[in-house]
């Protein structure tokens, strides 16, 4: 092989600083007491926009379209993965109650209903009781009056029975009172007219002659 070319002496003077940086004659700070001299560090120039100047941006009106989540955007909101439900190893028999067992019959409260007597029946009953008390106070009645009072009561029946009609009883009571008043008036008129004519009445209270006390029989004229 051919030997490597040897550089010229002039060129070696340029590259000797690469191998021995201490011999570099560039600007440097004064050497420290312990260590090599410090080099200046040149900062790269900022090629961006100057301060307080906004970059030019093309502004467009907001669109009315709804944003559509893509595969890339979905990762930003969270990783969506299907939920896996583990399989049940054992079998469970669920027994649901039937409809017949769930239905509970409703129990209605028992309410005692008392049949109220009509007002007319109670009024008539009170009238009958007062009439009986008045009859007892007056004393024993004649046979005709007793029969007349007993017949309508027997025919009408019990006033508290459901088939009892209170209206006929009121009419019978009124008719009874009217007939009694008429009988007493007729008896008084008959007695007054009989005594006014001068006829005698034979009674248990009159004397033997058949004339009332305090009166003399009229003299008979002999022809």
Curated annotation (Swiss-Prot):
Ranges annotated as biased composition (Polar residues): 145-163, 174-186
Chain intervals with Basic and acidic residues compositional bias: 110-138
Region described as Disordered: 110-223
Family indicated by similarity: Belongs to the UPF0607 family.
Entry protein name: Putative UPF0607 protein LOC392364
Organism of derivation: Homo sapiens
